[in-house]
Amino acid sequence: MDENMNYTNTHKSLYDDIALWEKTDGRDLFAQMPLAPHVKGSPTVLDFGYGFGENLFALSNAYPNGKIYGIDCSPVCQKEVGEKIAARGIKNITLINKEVHNLQDFADESLDLVLLYDALHGGDGKGKYMLYEESHRVLKSGACLSILPVHLNNWRDHEGKKKTYTPAKIKAELAEYGFSYAGTCTQKGVHWEKCHTLYYIKKGNITFDILEKVDVMNFVKK
């Protein structure tokens, strides 16, 4: 286990299994994104809320010639992921380490893929709709918005009321923001919460196998 994690009670193989996922199933997941053919090998990608970097590193493996950006406001995540990038000598990941209320760091129609993985629940709902609007602005025509639909009983509607969302409701909502559903991938996305949340870590013996695996939802900008 990486000593920088400062975690106990996780299974000794967990972080080796995560590193393997980043090089295999995770890489394959992102290689299956419905990207335009001319950018397939070298897309410009944003992972909003990159956390501890699992998806960032898998994206880097899937698109070694791409430009991978990550946004996160957590100092703990910023430190750990930054150190891993340096230690691994990765050149195609750029971190944007700050709290944001829009995607102003990116120009209109400048991105080929945006990930909103475990990023749309909680709060008052305004953040979710901001991300819908801003994703549509920064994505190129025909580019992909990929969502990992977790915590669906803790999403908010336009009035800020907690609602239980379904895939059908997510599709309908994204259609209002100019996106059409483009299917899922053979590989499932991983919900990393149990790896990094003290509540679960205290329970002990966290293994890769018990992490929630979810079908991602891919949308294309109309």
Specify the residue positions occupied by each region the protein language model found.
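Conserved SAM-binding loop of SAM-dependent methyltransferases across substrates and taxa
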Residues: 52-64
